[in-house]
């Protein structure tokens, strides 16, 4: 399918997607009942969307186009009420978190759709292993040139987004030692990591045409880069975050991304080049492994500081850009998370360090999501 023309969007508008865990008490393993929930919810969700993701244990919720995080919060709150009521009716529980701590990929059922069937045929067991749960944030852009500048600008802050959302230390019943183990799942996929460098929208269109011409991909949706343009929506989509344990944290991360986007497109502080990505994967690894305590290396100067320290430095630049977007409260929350070392991954590990079992952890995460 040829690349769609870039559809102009109101700048800095938001669309937020969250992939949620559908859990079956009393054992608190993943359920295979998302289709049942979605069928029951379709007529009850009036703003935003509830839909399938890869496997039957995943439930995706998505806002419509939102002006600010207040509208995002309102849409998600309304969806959450309906989802929790419906889940209770079917004796299910909903949870956040980037991974389920002890599910086995072998028992996952891929959703019934032509697209997922093709994906399963191509990638085999990797698709079932990708039963992990992420947050995606779309940011509106006026044109493709803005989108390419924003894509490269936001790529500098991928470690920040990973560290702030990290909530997947456990996988397959074991502590992985990572703050976010979710992203490691995608390392075997050929489109893992950053998008190939394109200096402008015209160059991106040519690059995509070559990919599509070789039949490697059929649409932009087949490219699961960390950040990608979505020309049909007129957005840039950030895809690296774990689903946090709470809606509040997810919304604040979206506001943080929105404020950074405003700053980037207003000030144009960087002259992007391919060499900017030289240590991208090293910085991303540090965020996945150590979260906010990970080491961030400046590709230009070689200067190093923790990701948490760099977030605090960045917040000082963003306030004047957050204010007109009604995102100041998000920056205040991000500041609090970093200063207090308040992260989902610490909360999870503290619970198990105190003797909590992994099934009890899932129960607790479900209660946190519903609170």
From Swiss-Prot:
GO terms of molecular function = ATP binding; glutamate-cysteine ligase activity
Q: Which family does it belong to?
A: Belongs to the glutamate--cysteine ligase type 2 family. YbdK subfamily.
Cysteines engaged in disulfide bonds, as pairs: none
HAMAP family registered for this protein in UniProt: Glu_cys_ligase_2
User: How would you summarize the oligomeric state and partners of this protein?
Assistant: Homodimer.
Which Gene3D superfamilies does the entry link to? 3.30.590.20
Protein name listed in UniProt: Putative glutamate--cysteine ligase 2
Q: Where on the tree of life does the source sit, at the highest rank?
A: Bacteria
Organism name: Cronobacter sakazakii (strain ATCC BAA-894)
The Gene Ontology biological process terms listed for this entry are: modified amino acid biosynthetic process
Q: Any idea of its EC number?
A: 6.3.2.2
Question: Lineage of the source organism?
Answer: Bacteria, Pseudomonadati, Pseudomonadota, Gammaproteobacteria, Enterobacterales
Pfam short name (any one) = GCS2
What keywords appear on the UniProt entry? ATP-binding, Ligase, Nucleotide-binding
What broad class of enzyme is this? ligase
Reactions catalysed, as given in the entry? L-cysteine + L-glutamate + ATP = gamma-L-glutamyl-L-cysteine + ADP + phosphate + H(+)
Role played: ATP-dependent carboxylate-amine ligase which exhibits weak glutamate--cysteine ligase activity.
């Amino acid at each position: 399918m040829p690349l769609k023309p870039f559809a102009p969007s109101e700048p800095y508008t938001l669309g937020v997607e969250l992939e949620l865990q559908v859990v079956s008490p009393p054992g608190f393993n993943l359920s295979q009942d998302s289709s049942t929930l979605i069928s029951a919810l379709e007529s009850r969700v009036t703003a935003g969307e509830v839909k399938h993701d890869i496997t039957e244990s995943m439930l995706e919720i998505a806002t419509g186009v939102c002006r600010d995080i207040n509208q995002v919060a309102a849409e998600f709150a309304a969806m959450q009420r309906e989802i929790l009521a419906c889940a209770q009716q079917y004796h299910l529980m909903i949870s956040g978190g980037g991974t389920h701590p002890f599910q086995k990929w072998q028992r996952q059922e891929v959703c019934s759709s032509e697209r997922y069937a093709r994906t399963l045929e191509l990638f085999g067991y990797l698709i079932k292993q990708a039963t992990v749960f992420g947050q995606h944030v779309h940011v509106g852009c006026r044109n493709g040139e803005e989108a390419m500048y924003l894509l490269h600008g936001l790529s500098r802050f991928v470690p920040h987004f990973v560290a702030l959302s990290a909530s997947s230390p456990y996988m397959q019943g074991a502590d992985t030692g990572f703050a976010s183990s979710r992203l490691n799942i995608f390392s075997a996929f050929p489109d893992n990591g950053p998008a190939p460098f394109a200096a402008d929208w015209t160059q991106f269109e040519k690059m995509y045409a070559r990919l599509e011409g070789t039949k490697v991909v059929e649409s932009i949706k087949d490219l699961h880069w960390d950040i990608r343009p979505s020309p049909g929506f007129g957005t840039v989509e950030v895809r690296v975050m774990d689903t946090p344990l709470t809606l509040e944290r997810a919304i604040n991360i979206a506001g943080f991304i929105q404020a950074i986007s405003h700053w980037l497109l207003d000030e144009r502080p960087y002259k992007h080049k391919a060499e900017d990505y030289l240590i991208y994967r090293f910085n991303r690894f540090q965020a996945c492994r150590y979260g906010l305590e990970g080491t961030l290396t400046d590709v230009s100067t070689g200067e190093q500081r923790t990701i948490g320290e760099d977030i605090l430095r960045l917040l000082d630049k963003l306030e004047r850009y957050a204010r007109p977007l009604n995102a100041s409260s998000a920056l205040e929350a991000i500041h609090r998370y970093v200063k207090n070392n308040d992260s989902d991954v610490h909360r999870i590990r503290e619970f198990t360090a105190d003797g909590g079992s992994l099934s009890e952890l899932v129960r607790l995460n479900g209660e946190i999501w519903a609170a």
